[in-house]
């Protein structure tokens, strides 16, 4: 047998192929390689493993690496990847294309969306990617009637008995189906399914829901009046038949496996029934193997037990392991209580002594030290004999060793004082009265509404609905509605909302993006509205640096009562940058003689000939009326650039022109531009009139462009794009810079004013001449750096992602977005991953998992806290990933942090939420590899002294791919 080493792995799998483009350090590539190798070794002698790396460490690529090794070793093997839903299914399928540089799966990968499609694909393709949501189909009456009729056929129930069952099912609304002609999932005949009907309709020795025959034999006809039991039996039959019709799977990969923790959920039952004994090996991916309690692992192991050839005593092994974990947790809690009760002076002495020499620490003269050492020995024994070996038998988990250094957790203490706190007090009294009158309500949920926003509280059930409110509580509700209404319409702001707005806007002013997680829809929408409104006020302040006394209606457009548009300074100046009859049109466009052929200086020496040729070309064109009557700088630019490029090639015949240069020399360039295609960027330059103006020397020099223009320094990046995409990108960015919500125009005028230019009025020619100087100012450099960073990100995306970016929020210049905007997750992701707008993304639960939002964001706000620490970690994992902005910045500045903000309104449920989620996080962290930490998970006024570093390292459970050196 071949020895599996890194060298062997690299002979066919190059996990580091994209390391440089994606900013992945070599050490992480090696860790991923080690993970793949260890996973393959583990799968040799066990049915399944958990790949549980912390969020953002590349589990997807590790899983693809394991799939690649499986296909390499067994070219005929079948692999199924089950994803959490349609969006992530598309993402996984797309990852195979990106993975091609590392290992080429060829055309063997197929996506599936529905169960029937999955069965067809899995029978005909070696690798299939399918969402677990495909199992949620089959609720329709047609599918259920077919399965009941199939049962009648198998059971040989005819006439009155079958009709009596149908009469009891769904109120007798459905009719029997002729199973001789009908097909299972629209594809499988009676002959296909008949061999598997006994397994489908009888539970036998398997666990789970009872079969239809079990119900009938036990309860007769009346059993079919229990709709829940019948539905479960029908689902069971559907899942069993699906599994029996599916070929054997060699490797089953399950993404976000923690979603299967609930044994009663439909997706968990489906996975158990469909894949029972239909796979040989399985790989479960999750950064949070358990969320609220370690016993959630039991469900994962129960799925491992469904593998073909799984050991019969697997369940007993698991129960023994969980019992050991319980003992370990009790010992740990005792140790924490003892340590916390130590005199701080003694604790400091112990810590210092233990870090030098544990034996010396044992000699300290204090009775508590002996107890401490007994706990340490007990923990060490349990860890080494059962806990670490038990986890390592089934799990690989790599940690971000420096995560606890660069992550900065910042609880923000928000105090609601005076009238601000009145709604909270009345709300509490209202809820208390409901409880006193035995009106059922979920107290925590309604309290969370109130700490989220007044809008969320108003839209909550107990305020929005009138039914069932006791008369004694109604007075509080009426008062609360009145107060909340006055506060929402007045100047008084919700304290947490005010904090969130101020924090995110201040960050945006510094050029930093913010990801806000908010689970209340009303709050999400209110945040978006207010962010846009306040940001407009901040943009106005930038304009006032140029026009100090200007009011909003002088700067921005307004609408009169008759809907007549009154244009402001911003809109008027924006039009000049976009209208090709104004010389400012050239300010943000690409000068091709400086970016494509770099021949502008050469052309200036031959200007007379170029002007002669350009004017001849000009007269061959037919343009619109406006462009015919006066200079159109887009038309003039194309004529001069085409003439100069053709002449340059004539004098340099040895040159092998690029596609872009060829397009520049193509006669169609005159009419359609660099993409040689008629589009929306031609403005008024298309028509049937002959130009009645000529290109002068002054105009020719202007359209050739001055040295130091915007795109000149980015020519190398632009050259990586095809001409059509290049044109679209430059035009869209030129428009983006002039949007109302973007401060570029105000910043430009501010710098122009400082340089002595007139801004009353703004002179186009003077401002255009100033542009190269502007790009050299600190302000201009900042804008240019943003655009360069955008380009660097953009050119590394695939064609689909590039389209998502250009069609996304950047197209409208949206400052803030939320996940209720109807935008696809991918489009929002791509836009947020650029340094341009949106600067703030307000996300709900949809964005918590599976999306990478880390390229240009290192700030996250948990506006609405949750009870589950795994959800908190998944949220943070959106921006804490390999190749993140934080990682890149820390290469040059080790003080850079990833900031995690927890806004907490004092005296409200926020405080309890924070304590509970942090207490639960302790076990998620400690049992899965982090050193024990008593300080971060302490909520007393006097936190205990931190443990010795040496002891923390000794007690940390190591689950990485390589064994830790003794």
Question: Predicted regions span which residues?
Answer:
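Helicase motor interdomain insertion/brace
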Residues: 1-42, 47-51, 57-836, 844-852, ...
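Short beta->alpha connector loops at strand-helix junctions that form conserved
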Residues: 863-866
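Conserved SF2 helicase motif VI
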Residues: 868-891
């Amino acid at each position: 047998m071949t020895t599996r080493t890194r060298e062997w792995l690299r002979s066919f799998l190059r996990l580091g192929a994209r390391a440089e483009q994606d900013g992945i350090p070599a050490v992480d590539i090696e860790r991923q390689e080690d993970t793949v190798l260890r996973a393959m070794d583990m799968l040799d002698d066990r049915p399944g493993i958990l790949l549980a790396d912390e969020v953002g460490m590349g589990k997807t690529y590790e899983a693809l690496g394991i799939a690649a090794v499986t296909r390499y070793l067994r070219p005929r093997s079948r692999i199924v990847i089950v994803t959490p839903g349609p969006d992530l299914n598309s993402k996984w399928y797309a990852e195979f294309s990106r993975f091609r540089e590392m290992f080429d799966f060829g055309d063997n990968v197929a996506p599936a969306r529905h169960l029937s499609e999955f069965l067809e694909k899995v029978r005909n393709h070696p690798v299939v990617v399918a969402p677990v949501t495909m199992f949620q189909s089959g609720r329709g009456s047609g599918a259920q009637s077919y399965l009941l009729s199939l049962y009648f056929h198998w059971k040989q129930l005819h006439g009155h008995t079958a009709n009596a069952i149908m009469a009891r099912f769904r109120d007798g609304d459905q009719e029997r189906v002729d199973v001789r002609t009908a097909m299972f999932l629209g594809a499988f005949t009676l002959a296909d399914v008949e061999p598997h009907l006994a397994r489908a309709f009888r539970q036998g020795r398997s666990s789970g829901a009872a079969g239809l025959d079990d119900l009938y034999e036990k309860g007769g006809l009346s059993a079919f009046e229990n709709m829940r039991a019948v539905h479960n039996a029908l689902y069971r039959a559907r899942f069993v038949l699906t599994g029996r019709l599916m070929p054997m799977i060699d490797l089953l990969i399950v993404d976000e496996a923690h979603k299967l923790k609930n044994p009663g959920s439909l997706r968990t039952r489906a996975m158990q029934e469909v894949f029972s004994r239909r796979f040989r090996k399985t790989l479960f991916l999750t950064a949070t193997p358990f969320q609220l309690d370690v016993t959630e692992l039991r469900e994962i192991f129960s799925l491992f037990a469904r593998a073909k050839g799984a050991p019969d005593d697997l369940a007993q092994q698991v129960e023994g392991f969980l019992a050991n974990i319980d003992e370990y947790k009790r010992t740990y809690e005792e140790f924490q209580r003892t340590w916390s009760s130590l005199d701080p002076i003694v604790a400091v002495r112990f810590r210092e002594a233990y870090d030098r020499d544990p034996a010396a620490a044992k000699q300290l003269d204090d009775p508590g030290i002996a107890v401490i050492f007994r706990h340490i020995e007990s923990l060490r024994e349990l860890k080494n004999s059962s806990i670490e070996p038990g986890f390592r038998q089934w799990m690989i988990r790599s940690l971000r060793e420096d995560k606890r250094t660069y992550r900065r957790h910042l609880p923000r203490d928000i105090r609601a004082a005076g009238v601000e706190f009145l709604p909270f007090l009345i709300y509490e009294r209202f809820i208390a009265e409901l409880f006193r009158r035995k009106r059922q309500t979920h107290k925590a949920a309604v309290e969370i509404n109130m700490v989220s926003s007044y809008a969320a509280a108003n839209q909550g059930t107990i305020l929005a609905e009138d039914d069932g409110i006791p008369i004694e509580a109604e007075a509080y509700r009426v008062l609360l509605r009145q107060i909340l209404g006055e506060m929402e319409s007045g100047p008084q702001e919700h304290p947490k909302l005010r904090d969130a707005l101020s924090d995110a806007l201040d960050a945006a002013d510094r050029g930093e993006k913010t990801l806000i997680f908010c689970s209340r829809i009303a709050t999400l929408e209110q945040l978006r509205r207010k962010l846009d409104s306040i940001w407009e006020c901040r943009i106005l302040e930038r304009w006032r640096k140029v026009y100090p006394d200007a009011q909003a209606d002088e700067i921005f457009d307004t609408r009169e009562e008759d809907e007549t548009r009154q244009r402001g300074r911003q809109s008027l100046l924006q039009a000049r940058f976009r209208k090709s009859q104004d010389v400012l049109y050239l300010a943000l466009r690409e000068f091709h003689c400086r970016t494509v052929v770099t021949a502008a200086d050469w052309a200036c020496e031959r200007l007379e000939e170029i002007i002669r040729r350009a004017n001849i070309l000009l007269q061959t064109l037919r343009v619109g009326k406006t462009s015919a009557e006066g200079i159109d700088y887009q038309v003039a630019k194309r004529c001069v650039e085409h003439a100069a490029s053709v002449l340059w090639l004539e004098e340099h015949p040895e040159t092998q022109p690029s596609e872009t240069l060829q397009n520049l020399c193509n006669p169609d360039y005159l009419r359609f531009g660099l993409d040689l295609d008629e589009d929306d960027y031609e403005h008024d330059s298309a028509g049937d009139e002959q130009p009645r103006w000529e290109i002068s020397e002054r105009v020719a020099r202007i359209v050739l462009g001055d040295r130091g223009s915007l795109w000149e320094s980015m020519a190398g990046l632009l050259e990586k794009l095809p001409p059509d995409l290049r044109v679209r990108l430059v035009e869209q960015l030129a428009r983006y810079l002039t949007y109302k919500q973007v401060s570029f125009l105000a910043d430009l005028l501010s710098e122009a004013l400082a340089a002595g230019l007139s801004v009353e009025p703004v002179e186009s020619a003077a401002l255009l001449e100033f542009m190269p100087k502007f790009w050299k100012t600190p302000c201009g450099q900042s804008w240019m750096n943003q655009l360069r960073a955008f380009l660097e990100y953009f050119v590394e995306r695939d064609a689909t992602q590039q389209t998502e970016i250009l069609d996304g929020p950047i197209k409208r210049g949206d400052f803030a977005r939320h996940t209720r905007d109807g935008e696809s997750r991918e489009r929002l992701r791509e836009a947020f991953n650029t340094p341009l707008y949106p600067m703030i993304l307000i996300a709900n639960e949809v964005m918590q998992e599976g999306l990478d939002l880390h390229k240009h964001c290192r700030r996250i706000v948990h506006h609405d806290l949750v009870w589950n620490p795994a959800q908190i970690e998944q949220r943070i994992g959106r921006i804490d990933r390999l190749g993140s902005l934080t990682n890149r910045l820390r290469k040059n500045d080790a003080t850079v942090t990833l900031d995690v903000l927890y806004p907490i309104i004092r005296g409200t449920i926020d405080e309890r939420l924070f304590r509970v989620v942090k207490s639960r996080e302790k076990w998620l962290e400690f049992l899965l590899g982090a050193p024990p930490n008593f300080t971060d998970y302490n909520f007393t006024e006097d936190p205990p002294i931190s443990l010795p570093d040496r002891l923390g390292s000794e007690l940390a459970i190591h689950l990485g791919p390589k064994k830790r050196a003794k």
